[in-house]
Structures are given as C-alpha cells and as structure tokens.
C-alpha cells in the first residue's frame, strides 16, 4: 500500500467518530480530499463531497460512511463510575473487560468496562445475559466529584482505537465498518485524479 494511502487509513481508524460526533473525522477527510479534488464541499447534513471533472454530464458517486458505533455518558454514580447509552448496535456480552475511551473536551480519558464480580453473582445471575445497564465504565475516579471534573454527561465513548496487523495481510481495528468503505471512496478519487475519464467523479 502506498504511504499516503496507508497514512489516510490510519488517520480514519484512529479518529473517533460515533454517530452524531463525526466532525473530527470529517475534517480528516476534507483535508485529504482537498489535495486532489477540484472542489470539496460539506452539505447541511455534514456530508463531505469531493469531486473531479464536475462539468461532465455523466456523474458517478462512490460513497462510504464515517460513523462508528459508540456510547454516550448518561450518568455518573457516587463511586465515580460512568453509565452509558448505546449509539448503534452493541453486544453487551462482548463489552465486559473492554478498554474504552471517553472523548472529553479536555481530551481522551481511558476507561475499562466492568460489572458485578463473578464471585458475587448468584446462580441465576450467572445464567443471564449481561445488559448494558448492568455495566459501567471505570476511569479510576475516587468518587462522583472526581469523575465529574474530567467527564461530562453527553461525552461520547468508543472502544480503545488502534490498528493491528494480523497474518495473511489482514488487520483489525474498531470502526472498520465502514471507515474502510470511506477510505475506498476517497482513495479511488485520489487514484483517478491523474487519469483521463469522461464522467464527473464524486466521493461522498
């Protein structure tokens, strides 16, 4: 993979963008598209639209979405634990013990998801599927006041972001759905930029 393309993919995957909180990653896309597009605009919904050869009568659009599943902080209890509401579809069973990041105005705050300890669960509780309201985020706060000094109700939360390469030229990262599709759309525009084509090419 070319260096510029790889750096763009990394930037997308390492930039948080839960649904409703996509502005930061949209800035990444605008900057990248601006290098090769004839024009880059943003519509009222926040869609970033980059175009080459806009005067052509035939138009072709390649689209991807930049948001990812996440959470939003809705409550801080007396112990300083954070409770959240889902943004998108999560399986709570897969969340226990996950490293998370709360994206605050002052910067990222590291957290881990916890629940009632296994040795404290009765037999019936052990058989039940975990629910989101039974899970909390521990940021290491001493109490509610300590947590509230860094976290605000409404702050978005994601899995700890990052990128790991695996065997056979594969990789994993939170948010690959659909940031890889977004990357394909704008990388296609970049690669087509120095080639002759008869249509107006839009990456959205």
Can you describe what each PLM-predicted range is?
Residues 1-204:
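N-terminal hydrophobic/helix-forming segments and targeting peptides
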């Amino acid at each position: 993979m070319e260096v510029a393309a790889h750096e763009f993919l990394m930037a997308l995957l390492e930039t948080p963008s839960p649904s409703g909180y996509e502005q930061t990653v949209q800035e990444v896309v605008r900057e990248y598209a601006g290098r090769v597009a004839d024009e880059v605009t943003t519509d009222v919904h926040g869609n970033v639209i980059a175009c080459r050869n806009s005067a052509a009568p035939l138009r072709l659009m390649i689209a991807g979405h930049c948001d990812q599943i996440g959470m939003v902080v809705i409550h801080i209890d007396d112990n300083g634990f954070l409770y959240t509401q889902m943004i998108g579809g999560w399986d709570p069973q897969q969340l226990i013990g996950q490293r998370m990041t709360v994206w605050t105005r002052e910067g990222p705050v590291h957290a881990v998801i916890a629940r009632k300890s296994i040795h404290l669960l009765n037999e019936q509780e052990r058989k039940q599927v975990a629910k989101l309201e039974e899970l909390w985020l521990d940021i290491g706060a001493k109490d509610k006041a300590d947590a509230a000094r860094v976290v605000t109700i409404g702050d978005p939360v994601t899995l700890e972001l990052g990128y790991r390469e695996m065997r056979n030229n594969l990789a994993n990262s939170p948010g690959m759905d659909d940031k890889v599709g977004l990357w394909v759309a704008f990388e296609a525009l970049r690669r087509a930029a120095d080639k002759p084509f008869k249509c107006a090419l839009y990456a959205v």
